[in-house]
Amino acid sequence: MRNRAGNVRGRACRSWEGGALAAGLLALALLCGCAGRQAAPAPTPDPAGEPASAPVPALPKASPETVARHEPTPTPEPTPFSIAWITDTQTMTMYPSLAPALLPTFRWIAQSREEYNTQLLIHTANFVENGWNPLHWKRINPAIALLEGELPFLPVAGNHDVAKKVLSYEPYLAQPFIAWQAPERQYRGGEGYCERFTAGGTDFLVLGLGYLSVNEAGLAWAREVFRQNDDCVGILAVHSYLSYGSDRTSELTGHGALLRQEVVAPCGNVRMVLSGHVKGNALRIENFDDDGDGQPERQVVCMRHNYQQNRYPDQVGYLRMLIFDPVSRAVSVLTCAPAQGSFTAAPDRADEEHFTIENAF
């Protein structure tokens, strides 16, 4: 079956034609020592509380026609591809001594697009320490500008971006990268955003929802977009989802509990949730029984990754490459710091920095 853009759509892959990229990504997974590792599912705990958000007006329903596809060129064959993921860059905008890491980090993301077959960069918020401080935006915007015309970008607003002075999207929505967005894919002018693309023979819908929009109207918009694009593998990108816990289990934040109940659970195509906010790394894998037959049909992978200078004094410019294998349906996670030339896991954090998740999409 083919979708409206003429790209092959489907979840099953017939074969994998090897090549330099495929071999390289497989070698990378083996080098990381992560092939076949999977965390155990975690039970659903009582969520921690989180401040309530002000209500916003609901938007008209989204439709597949309004969720237009973006560059890069789709890859209909089952070829490995990647999504780049960065979060909580706030300390690099706050401290002049750390700000020089921003340009090389974003430059590497843009320049490595072909090598990793990168389809998208997701930023799960807290771009800056204080969204009302123009100097902080001045430090990061030149780095983000390197992506323009090079790589699709899905930003999410966090509490530091919109809530340090008053609860308002005003400083965030004034940033240049919001103007890159297609209006038909925005929620309330950039408070939320979605990207639909085809890679490895599979259609994906990635949806980002800002920190102040985790409320009745914002949740309804997210739910409707996922449901109108139920032919896609869904990825939800938010700032706050996983709370404190061990590196392999985690409770939910207040926002996380709402998002799980109102979006993740009812939308049967959501397979992954990415978040930051809380410092450190966490992984939570949960199974959902969507048809009520007593047997889980859907695995949802939830990850948090947040390297900040005050948690890891020598670690700045960290990001994750999520490497999708469309044949095995596994995702290999590579945590790296290109600005430092670091692509190997720290010995004391190897299991949480380089690993593979089976049945991930």
Stretches with model-predicted labels:
Residues L30-G33:
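C-terminal motif of bacterial Sec signal peptides marking the signal peptidase cleavage site
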Residues A35-R37:
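Bacterial signal peptide processing site
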Residues D46-L135:
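N-terminal active-site segment of His-dependent metallophosphoesterases
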Residues E77, R320-F361:
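A short C-terminal boundary segment appended to hydrolase-like catalytic domains
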Residues P80-T93, T202-L212, I235-A237, Q299-N306, ...:
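Active-site-proximal beta-strand elements of phosphoester/diester hydrolases
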Residues W85-T87, L120-N126, P152-N159, L209, ...:
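Active-site neighborhood of phospho(di)ester-bond hydrolases with catalytic His/Asp-centered motifs
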Residues N133-A220, P266, L283-H305, G317-I323, ...:
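Extended active-site neighborhood of metal-dependent phosphoesterases/phosphodiesterases
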Residues S213, L219, R227-R271:
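Active-site-proximal segments of metal-dependent phosphoesterases and phosphodiesterases across multiple
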